[in-house]
Amino acid sequence: MASVVVVGSQWGDEGKGKITDFLSQEADVVSRYQGGDNAGHTIVFNGQTFKLRLIPSGIFFHDKLAVIGNGVVLNPKSLVEELQYLRDKGVNPDNLRISNRAHVILPYHITLDGAQEKAKAGGKIGTTNKGIGPAYMDKAERIGIRVADLLDKDTFAALLKRNLAEKNQIITKLYDLEPLKFEDIFDDYYAYGQTLKPFVTDTSVVINDALDNGQRVLFEGAQGVMLDIDQGTYPYVTSSNPVAGGVTIGSGVGPSKIDNCVGVLKAYTSRVGDGPFPTELFDEVGDFIRETAHEYGTVTKRPRRIGWFDSVVLRHAKRVSGFTHLSLNCLDVLTGLKTIKVCTAYDLNGETIYHYPASLKELEACKPIYEELPGWDEDITGVKTFEELPTNAQNYLRKLEELVGVKIATFSVGPDREQTNVIDHNIWG
């Protein structure tokens, strides 16, 4: 038995899909445990680029299972479209498994998501308007519709009628929008459910059986620790728990079955949407990194905010997720910069602090304390080992390890799988 959790250590978009795809070569099961189609991941496979929102990267290997766990909120329409997208590109998705306990996103969730965000005016949190938050709200309120409910025609009809009666009161009276009609939703979404039915099962049983039989399971998180609803920059967060602890709840697997946790990070920092970002760059260096790395959201297409590497963020992420290894991406993006800054701590009203504050007011007052390191000009995109890196690039990686307190197991010098280089071969234990 062996299991590894892949967790984003910043604000998402760290390249989790790339390292998950890399690690999945040695996995038997690849499982996603939270989030929805609000976060995309980009995977390059056999020379083709795939942009997926819901389906785990294990889908590309027919000798592996790709699992969508119970902690995911599932838009049936999006998933059916994603399955067709894969088929159109020559990928057979028959190795997909979907939890019968996963909650379903319906049109009223999307309508409410947009209306609620619009009503917040200056207090917007940067939602993707995919209905994720309202779906998780229904789950917590115990009125959500699960995949198991979607598959039963009578059950789905009864629950949809009940929920629409309540949601339309909010949609029409609070937000002054047109009500949604039962007949505009029921037939289409029941049909989506029937299309997905062959993939639906109790995924907790699937995963635990695999582990009990000595197979390797890779758990794939969406977003990142700093977007975690409990540990992130609340309220500028997602509605679920991307931290490693989310695996046990979102997959139906006990904590004793989790072996290692890989924190994925960029060689710098990026963020989409509003919220605190102490090391954010507003100059030509930020523009250079954004354009060099094509830093635009996979789903939203929004330009990402760019900043220097922040070790305060990484230490926080390490602490709350228990990283055993780091996987660093985009090292090549920094090539050409004369000087590279690394945030070692914050100055909070004259006091040096090393831990990430919970208070937004304190975060606004925090000023990053930087250490400057010399950059490099050499092309590193063809590098295959740590030793082949320029000395300054080696020193940069060692500095990050020192500041975070976790060793880097892999580093990437480009988007292709072949550009992922391994330092520590014992991620699987």
Swiss-Prot record:
A Pfam family name for this chain? Adenylsucc_synt
Active-site annotation: D13 (proton acceptor), H41 (proton donor)
Where Mg(2+) binds, per the record, is at D13, G40
Keywords, ordered alphabetically: Cytoplasm, GTP-binding, Ligase, Magnesium, Metal-binding, Nucleotide-binding, Purine biosynthesis
Q: Which cofactor does it need?
A: Mg(2+)
Q: Which reaction does it catalyse?
A: IMP + L-aspartate + GTP = N(6)-(1,2-dicarboxyethyl)-AMP + GDP + phosphate + 2 H(+)
Q: Which residues bind GTP?
A: 12-18, 40-42, 304, 330-332, 412-414
Instruction: Give GO terms for biological process.
Output: 'de novo' AMP biosynthetic process; IMP metabolic process
Q: In which pathway does it act?
A: Purine metabolism; AMP biosynthesis via de novo pathway; AMP from IMP: step 1/2
Coiled coil stretches, renumbered: none
Give the family from UniProt. Belongs to the adenylosuccinate synthetase family.
- Which NCBIfam families did the record assign? PRK01117.1 (NF002223), purA (TIGR00184)
- This chain belongs to the protein called Adenylosuccinate synthetase
Q: Which organism is it from?
A: Lactiplantibacillus plantarum (strain ATCC BAA-793 / NCIMB 8826 / WCFS1) (Lactobacillus plantarum)
Q: Which gene encodes it?
A: purA
